[in-house]
Structure formats: C-alpha cells, structure tokens
Swiss-Prot record:
Function, as annotated: Phosphorolytic 3'-5' exoribonuclease that plays an important role in tRNA 3'-end maturation. Removes nucleotide residues following the 3'-CCA terminus of tRNAs; can also add nucleotides to the ends of RNA molecules by using nucleoside diphosphates as substrates, but this may not be physiologically important. Probably plays a role in initiation of 16S rRNA degradation (leading to ribosome degradation) during starvation.
Aminoacyl-tRNA synthetase keyword on record: no
Swiss-Prot/TrEMBL keywords: Nucleotidyltransferase, RNA-binding, rRNA processing, Transferase, tRNA processing, tRNA-binding
Name the UniProt record assigns to this protein: Ribonuclease PH
Alphabetical list of Pfam families matching this protein: RNase_PH (PF01138), RNase_PH_C (PF03725)
Source species: Bacillus cereus (strain ATCC 14579 / DSM 31 / CCUG 7414 / JCM 2152 / NBRC 15305 / NCIMB 9373 / NCTC 2599 / NRRL B-3711)
BP GO annotations: rRNA catabolic process; rRNA processing; tRNA processing
C-alpha cells in the first residue's frame, strides 16, 4: 500500500473542470490528487514569422508556478527577469506534445497559445499540464468550428500524460505524488495518444539503474493510466467528442 493508500497502478483522484476561466477560448482546471493546474488556450489569428506563408498553424506553450504552489514560497521567475532551464524544458515539452496531435494545416495560419499555471504542486505538474492543456485546446478549437473558421476540429488524436516510477520496496508505481517522486529510484514521464502511440518518454535512474523488463513494466503501467486519463478527457469534453472521433 502506498503512502496515500492507493494501489501500485492506481491513478490519483482526477477532476477536469472545463471552461474554468471567463476570457480564454478554452480553459480547464485539472486536479490530479493535490496537484492543481489551470490550463488556458488562446487562438491568435496569425503565426510566428518563421511560419508565415506556409498555410499552417502553430501551437506553443508557457508554464509557470505561483509562489505558494509549493510548501515553501518560491520567487516568481518574472522577478528574476528570466525563466529557469526547468521551466523552459517543460513548456517546450507541452508545446511539442500538443503539436504531435494537431492537424496544423487544418488549423490554418493561426497560433494556439497554451498557458499552464500550477496553483498547487504535489508531483506530476508537467504531465497534468499536458493532459489538461489538450482539453483546453480542443475547447478552443470547438469555438473556431462554431464560428465556421475551420471545417473540422483540427486534432488527429487524443493526448494525455502521466508519470511512473520505481519507489523503494513498492516496485513500479503509477502517477507519483511529491513524496514518492522525491525518493524514487527511477522516475519516468510518458506521453501517449489515444491510439497507443508514444509521443515522448523521459526516464532516468536516480543513483539507480533499471532493467529492460522493468522498463516494459513501467510503460505498461503508464499506458494503462493514460487510457484512463483519455476516458476522463472524453467525459469532460462531452458532445465535442463526436467531432473528434
């Protein structure tokens, strides 16, 4: 039994609140256990200079944490005048993952800005951001469809992410909270599509190694969790799902 009473391959309690903010074209508050992230999607009727004239759109992301998202207050990165390497890595990961399932040609010459703001952190903030951002993005695309600016919702598949790891005597566990993540021998983030295709796998041993058999076990656990997350995304999107499938 894990520190929070879950089974080894059990997700934390997940809730996706849609249309959480008034102004963005799409927004959600995603809760993954005690991790809470607000994800918003903004549609801009232009593309970056390097994309002009190509007839395709672009998806990019920004990621941040409020100062007391963590147990100890952290200084806002805007106060420092630059983002950290960790933040840059995460926002590139979010944008890259979403672009893998967006039909950029069907989107047209538009930019989708994804903003992920962590308001409470208890492990898995980047994977929660990706899972929530996908829903926010599809909600924004539905607005484009309703306005007849696109002929279909420009996504090719679903997308979700979770963490897996090897924690001391527990072995392989799914969806690590902070207490588990901080003592994990192996930590891995996995992003997959609804068709079971991998978008990204990030895995490292923390002063430890892992075998090929353990890698397979980690990926199996992640796949199971991601398919559950995609079912929750579909539930959150409601009737919009009919425009995707």
């Amino acid at each position: 039994m894990r520190v929070d009473g879950r089974e080894k391959t059990e997700l934390r309690h997940i809730h996706i609140h849609t249309n959480y903010l008034k102004h963005p074209e799409g927004s959600v508050l995603i809760e993954v256990g005690d991790t809470k992230v607000i994800c918003s999607a903004t549609i801009e009727e232009r593309v970056p200079p390097f994309m002009r004239g190509e007839g395709k759109g672009w998806v990019t992301a920004e990621y941040a944490m409020i100062p007391r998202a963590t147990e100890q207050r952290t200084i806002r990165e805007s106060s420092k005048g630059k983002v950290t390497g960790r933040t840059m890595e995460i926002q590139r990961l979010i944008g890259r993952a979403l672009r893998a399932v967006v039909d950029l040609e069907a989107l047209g010459e538009r930019t989708v800005w994804i903003d992920c703001d962590v308001i409470q952190a208890d492990g898995g903030t980047r994977t929660a951001s990706i899972t929530g951002a996908y829903v926010a993005m599809v909600l924004a695309f539905e607005k484009l469809l309703q306005a007849e600016k696109v002929s279909k919702i420009p996504v090719k598949d679903y997308l979700a992410a979770t963490s897996v790891g090897i924690v001391e005597e527990q072995g392989v566990v799914l969806d690590l909270n902070y207490a588990e993540d901080s003592k994990a021998d192996v930590d891995m983030n996995v992003i997959m599509t609804g068709k079971g295709q991998f978008v990204e796998v990030q895995g490292t041993g923390e002063e430890a190694t892992f075998s090929r058999a353990q890698l397979n076990e980690l990926l199996d656990a992640a796949e199971q969790g991601i398919f559950q997350l995609i079912d929750m995304q579909k539930e959150a999107l409601g009737d919009i799902v009919s425009h995707i499938e």
